[in-house]
Swiss-Prot record:
Residues 290-295 are annotated as: S2 site. GO terms for molecular function: cysteine-type deubiquitinase activity; zinc ion binding. Disruption phenotype: When irradiated with X-rays, adults display increased wing and eye abnormalities. Third instar larvae exposed to X-rays do not display any changes in pupation or eclosion. RNAi-mediated knockdown in third instar larvae results in reduced survival in response to UV radiation. This is Ubiquitin thioesterase Otu1. Its EC number is 3.4.19.12. It comes from the Eukaryota. The active site is at residues 158, 161, 267, 341. It is an enzyme of class 3 (hydrolase). Residues 263-267 are annotated as: His-loop. A zinc finger (C2H2-type) spans 317-341.
Amino acid sequence: MTGSFSVKLKSKKGQFIVNDLNEHTTLGELKTKIVQATDIEATQLHVLVGYPPKPLDLSQQQEQRALKAVGINSGETLIVEEKAAPAPAAPVPGGTTVEDDEALARRLQAEEEAQLLQETAGGPVAQAADYQLPVAPTESGPNGDFNGILLKKVVPADNSCLFTSIRFVLNGKVDNEGSEMMRHIIAQEVAADPQSYNDAVLGKSNAEYCAWIQKADSWGGAIEVSILSNYYGIEIDVVDIQNAIINRFGEDKNFGLRVFLLFDGIHYDPLYMETSPSAAPATIFPVEELGVYQQAEQLANEAQSSRQYTNVDKFTLRCMQCDVRLVGQVQAQEHAKQTGHKNFGEI
């Protein structure tokens, strides 16, 4: 008996599951099903498959090949895009470039988590989204403030707190499922631009950094926030409570929406707005709404005044493996290099 399998289609029109496939289904047959599901003409189909997504050869010479032979397996996600039809008087383009494919993959992959909110800020709401992400209410209180309180959502104090926090502000979930994907996204971006991400910027070679950031025990910081801000098309404002300032990543890109993270010197937590006990927490806010930003500034000042931060240059640590006392991050790192000890506790 021939085993059946399915694939997922992700397109601007929406997301679809194609179930009635088997190991003998041809690429030509799948093309027909994609056309039926997405209403895109066969001659204008542009399909990406795999991770990182790569363009699928849809030429007539390939149409009789079985799906598995062209690299499509059960459970695969296919990113489907419509190529612009060439103008009658213009020469036919030679095809999309690698840069086009990478930009397309980033755009559609980010769409599942952030596109609906981007469109809410500047146009009609898309019908294709699987779910609506939390967004701040439009009602304003006195002085333009939102009718809600900006609060900290505590996330696990592990090596992925930055990625967990970003996942929460994008989709309202506290889990570690998106950390590996975000690390991979960052590594791809860095590897693709060795001139910008050189040894001086990274503190290590480009290749070493790309391997390092994909390890589960590597911390994220400014470089990673900047890349993810650009990838998701949203401003990420990091509220630095040690210095009582807000670092706006993506400010120069004029994004329409922003999220807030709280940083105490060693740990990130996401910020959200609670508008009522029954409403879902709001985590994404229009940039032009200054009331929320002012709340974040106030929170930073209050946290600094009460010293709710860790000064990584002056805090005192104890090595939990040999009981030696250390002052600051530099001493701790040097001790770790010399001894291999990695378990420290703050005193």
